Regions:
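Short flexible coil/turn linkers enriched for glycine and charged/polar residues
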Residues: 23, 198-201
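Nucleotide/phosphate-binding catalytic cleft detector across ATP-hydrolyzing
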Residues: 1-68, 73-194, 209-218, 222, ...
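A structural feature that tracks compact, well-ordered secondary-structure segments
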Residues: 203-205
Length: 349
């Protein structure tokens, strides 16, 4: 990545740039529209395998607008359509090109399927080698992960992109949680804590003036909630994933499913806060801050009502060795990472 203080030092932005949040559950691309506003395109990073025994069904699905590709006599339904089909038909297994924040080594078609979806989201570019910053996780502290290898796989996917005019992109990685600080903490001189609660990982960063002081990830986030809550109530993770979008963490649970989801949310947040406390303990000799430190949360798993309040409770109980200021959940928190990637690209040297 380029100089991480670039956003502070270079107020003029690059005219053409792209930001890409390549997450375990969501793929999001951010560009500027003609008016200079942020414009987003999103797809779910998932697919279904459908044997092509009945060509009529395949053709009907295609006519209905289901994104489909065909390979080796197998049809693949992509994105949101795949999730909806898996939810309505329990016999279908939803497959994921990424798991725990990284490319899924068990899915042999992950590279090709992700390439198709990401290239489609990028759409057309206006010049050759258009600068594109894409999100990568930090290495996990609770499982063995290889963020560098994952970043190279994503780089290869992006370098294989070609527009209709033959234009390419120039991909560069940026830490996912640092991108949130670029997106949401300009008013605090890019100083604060950020946590991206995605599908596969929680990514955390503490930065001062745009420079990361510590960062880490935890392989226990949205998918983990789905898996553990499903196990507790005897449902499928796909069912829990749908129910999770309806949960309100400010209200007492009234069903077994709600109780399981709320319990797993609290466990995930408590674990994250414990590791943040350790992060500050490890660097406290090298930093000195008496000011309040704002905390930004983003990502789809942070979307439920009451998430911010539950995080605040856990932070108070943990007695973090810094003065926590505002807990900020942006209105468009699902898009914060992609927005930060775009801002980094626009201000790169």
């Amino acid at each position: 990545m380029g100089d991480s203080s670039a956003l502070v030092n270079r107020p003029k932005r690059r005219k053409m740039a792209i930001g890409a949040d390549i997450g375990t559950y969501n793929l999001i691309v951010c560009k500027r529209d003609d008016a200079g506003s942020f414009s987003y395109k999103k797809e779910v990073n998932a697919f279904l395998e459908l044997p092509l025994e009945n060509r009529f069904v395949f053709n009907m699905m295609k006519q209905a607008g289901v994104p489909l590709i065909e390979r080796d006599n197998i049809a693949y339904a992509l994105g949101d359509a795949a999730v909806n089909m898996a939810y309505t038909m329990n016999s279908l297994e939803l497959k994921r090109p990424m798991v725990a924040g990284c490319v899924n080594p068990k899915e042999k078609d992950a590279f090709q399927i992700m390439s198709i979806m990401i290239h489609s989201l990028i759409g057309e570019v206006s010049q050759d080698k258009e600068l594109l910053y894409y999100s990568v996780p930090a290495n996990a502290i609770n499982e063995e992960t290889d963020a560098d290898y994952h970043g190279k796989i994503l780089e290869a996917i992006l370098r294989s992109y070609r527009s209709e005019k033959g234009f390419s992109v120039d991909p560069r990685p940026i830490n996912e949680a640092l991108a949130i600080i670029y997106a949401e903490l300009a008013h605090k001189s890019y100083t604060g804590i950020s946590a991206s609660f995605g599908g596969g990982m929680v990514n955390v960063c503490y930065a001062m003036f745009g420079n990361p002081i510590f960062s880490f990830s935890i392989v226990n986030s949205g998918d983990w909630i789905d898996k553990m809550a499903a196990k507790a109530v005897g449902e499928s993770p796909t069912f829990i994933n749908k129910e999770k979008t309806k949960i309100d963490l400010t209200k007492p649970a009234t069903t077994l499913v709600e109780r399981a989801i709320q319990t797993q949310y609290r466990l995930m947040i408590e674990h994250t806060v414990t590791e943040i406390k350790k992060g500050f303990a490890n660097v406290q000799k090298n930093i000195r801050t008496e000011d309040q430190v704002d905390f930004v949360v983003a990502g789809g798993t942070a979307s439920p009502n009451g998430f911010k309040e539950m995080l605040g409770e856990c932070l108070k109980q943990a007695d973090i060795p810094v003065n926590i200021g505002q807990i900020i959940k942006p209105e468009d928190n699902l898009y914060s990472v992609a927005k930060g990637c775009l801002l980094a690209a626009e201000n790169a040297k």
